[in-house]
């Protein structure tokens, strides 16, 4: 299953055609909540195909040509984990010029540099292709390749892994400004971090939490973890000192959680493009953690507030232009920290 934004699968083959049987839960979602995937060929920067999964089970032609050729194909999930699921049942390769002579080649090699991005909607690329005038969010406007996360990885020639969910935070989910600030801690990022895909387990398989697959931190070891959380928490803290302290303590605890699972990884904490009310709090939490954890290389990176001149995405989310500015700042910090 392709769960979080930008989750992908790549393969190489020799033949004329490749198809994939894909499952989803499209029938349980509105059109604007359905899953989107993109198909890339070789090292192309732009996808050859981009499509919405309209059925609960369908066969998709990934690639087709008239002559036998060697091709690398990558399927990338563009929509995020909160919405419709995407599972690959099977991939079939054929050679219609030389029947039976299709060849599945060794898979592409992973990049040496690995970065994990732990965040919310901004990390997903939520609404990055939409407009602030949009009244309803559409997964069609979600594109992680235009988020600071994948843009940062591109600048650093690194392979990204996203753990991101829109509207969720460290101590609370987003609370509308017109609502009473009652904390919503039913589905938070520290909990999600422990599982491979909690959303899939809960919403698609309807499994009990005790049966959810936990993430294998021994198998995946990034050199850097970038944490961009706090924007949703600010909807609750609202510059109230006691709430800011509550958030700071929880953020320090989160840093210990991430470091415990990734003891050899450097950490960058960051915030600021959409909301700056917790900037100093996250900076302070980072400093507090660093003081008691000298074995961890960690740095806070302040991001500038988005400028309307650069456009505004759906529900005031950052545009690609804003995300590129953020990516450059984070990439520059990573280069200094890791000598990349």
Regions found by a protein language model. Give the residues of each.
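Catalytic His-Asp segment of secreted/periplasmic serine-dependent ester chemistry enzymes
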Residues: 180, 235, 273-340
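Structural recognition of the beta-strand scaffold that forms the well-ordered cores
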Residues: 114-118, 123, 160-164, 223-228, ...
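Aromatic/hydrophobic pocket-lining residues that form the small-molecule binding cavity
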Residues: 247, 251, 323
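A structural motif corresponding to the C-terminal end of an alpha-helix
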Residues: 148-159, 257-266, 289-295
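Conserved SGNH/GDSL esterase-like catalytic core that processes O-acyl groups on lipids
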Residues: 4-6, 134-241, 245, 273-282, ...
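N-terminal secretory targeting modules
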Residues: 1-118, 122-144
